[in-house]
Amino acid sequence: MRQASVTLAMLAGFDSLLVQDALAQGKPPMPFRVQIVYSPLYVIDLGGLEKLHPFDIRKYEKIYKQLLLDGKISDQHALVPEPLTRDQFLLIHTEPYLQSLKVRENLIRYLEAPALRLAPVDLEKKIVEPVRLSSGGTLSAARAALEVGIGINLGGGYHHAKPESGEGFCIIADIPIAIRQLQADNRIKRALIVDVDVHQGNGTICCLRDDESTFTFSMHQDSIYPIPKEIGDLDIELQAGCMDDEYNRILEENLRRIMSSFQADIVFIVGGCDTLSGDPLAGLEMTTEGIVTRDALIVASCVEKNIPVVFTLAGGYSSEAWKTQYQSIRHLIDTYGVAK
């Protein structure tokens, strides 16, 4: 197994810089504990038809249950979110798009799931409502992060949803909505999005285009969906076969530069696991260790700068994806502890 250029041992040194850096900024250091956000109602159940879709919708449930089984959290620790309201949805999306989600064929197109034509169920209830809840989970995780430092939504990261349409399995732009709500509440002014899903977050870019209060940083594979790519604030295109060493070196170099020049009040991570070797929809060659290191690097960079951070799960289409994301979340809990 190739050793990631930035190791977990090296990242441990970041914590010692926290108090010094926070005091230099005139802000009290945050506690940086982990708050998990989850509801069993995130799970989409279509009587087995959901298994025909490449996305493992049960990965949220699998990760949560494994955290419980291994004693990393308790049921009492998990924060259960509220679903996004209509007004919150309209902070980013248009009214015509909201109405379009009531039309079966539109949902089938947005989710790229023709098998849903066979589902004898109300798709708005069985799909839109769980996604509305898990999107509310991103807002809940962000609010928690502002209090305890690290909010992890075991869902979310729907980075292909655009103001007027859905695509790429995504129908609600959860991160842009969370940013707009926090800004409306005067909780934040500026937000950084670090998108390390293998696919460019084209929807996020469209939602936040020409917005000086946000910065979109995406590292993604060059020759896969979406084509053509959108133009974000910083886009790093990677070729198929990219491995741990190269990936984390590029990430570290660019992340340090961005965080020095863009003063964010909160950071959102689109933590897709489709960079894992063997993912059927991509061609990068990262290992579980490399992805755990990747996520730890981003969070440690936020801790070093005393910036609250929100983690969302986004994509990951191999049978091992949930296990890798579990290892990453477990490592963050082991490193920072859970919020009390």
Please place each PLM-identified region on the residue numbering.
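N-terminal secretory signal peptides
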Residues: M10-A12
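N-terminal export leaders
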Residues: M1-T7
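HDAC/HDAC-like amidohydrolase catalytic core signature
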Residues: V6, D15-K340
